[in-house]
C-alpha cells in the first residue's frame, strides 16, 4: 500500500511521520520522498554525536528512509536561501514551514526490525521475508 499525507506549519516532521506509521500499523516501508519546507532544523551529521540546530527557512531537497517495527530511520537534505545544502539524520525538532508532503510505500513481503550491532554501535536493520 502507498500512503501520501501532508503536514502543516509548526508540525514536527519526524514525530508526525512516526505518529502516522504508528496509527496505520506500518511494520515495513520506505519513505519514498517528501517536498516542502522547514523553519527550524535538527539533524545529526555523519559520525557526529551532537545535533545540528538551525533556525532559518529551508527547502526539503530530499527525505528518504526505512520504516521498521516501532522505528523510523530517515535522512534529510535541506537547502538554505543561498542554495547551500546540508544533510544528515532527521531528528525531532524539524518544524514544518508552510507544508510538507510525504510519500510512503509499504513493503508487504517483509518485516523490518532493528537490533543493536556491537560492531557498528548502532541499531541496525534486520530484514525478514514474510
What are these regions (language model features)?
Residues 1-73, 77-130:
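N-terminal intrinsically disordered, cationic/polar leader segments
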Amino acid at each position: 500500500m502507498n500512503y501520501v499525507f501532508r503536514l502543516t506549519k509548526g508540525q514536527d516532521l519526524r514525530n508526525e511521520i512516526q505518529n502516522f506509521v504508528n496509527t496505520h500499523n506500518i511494520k515495513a516501508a520506505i519513505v519514498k520522498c517528501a517536498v516542502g519546507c522547514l523553519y527550524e532544523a535538527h539533524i545529526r551529521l555523519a559520525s557526529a554525536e551532537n545535533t545540528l540546530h538551525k533556525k532559518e527557512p529551508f527547502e526539503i531537497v530530499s527525505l528518504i528512509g526505512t520504516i521498521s517495527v516501532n522505528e523510523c530511520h530517515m535522512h534529510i537534505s535541506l537547502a538554505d536561501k543561498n542554495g547551500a545544502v546540508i544533510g544528515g539524520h532527521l531528528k525531532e525538532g524539524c518544524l514544518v514551514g508552510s507544508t510538507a508532503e510525504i510519500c510512503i510505500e509499504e513493503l508487504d513481503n517483509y518485516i523490518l526490525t532493528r537490533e543493536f550491532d556491537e560492531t557498528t554501535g548502532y541499531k541496525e536493520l534486520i530484514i525478514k521475508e514474510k
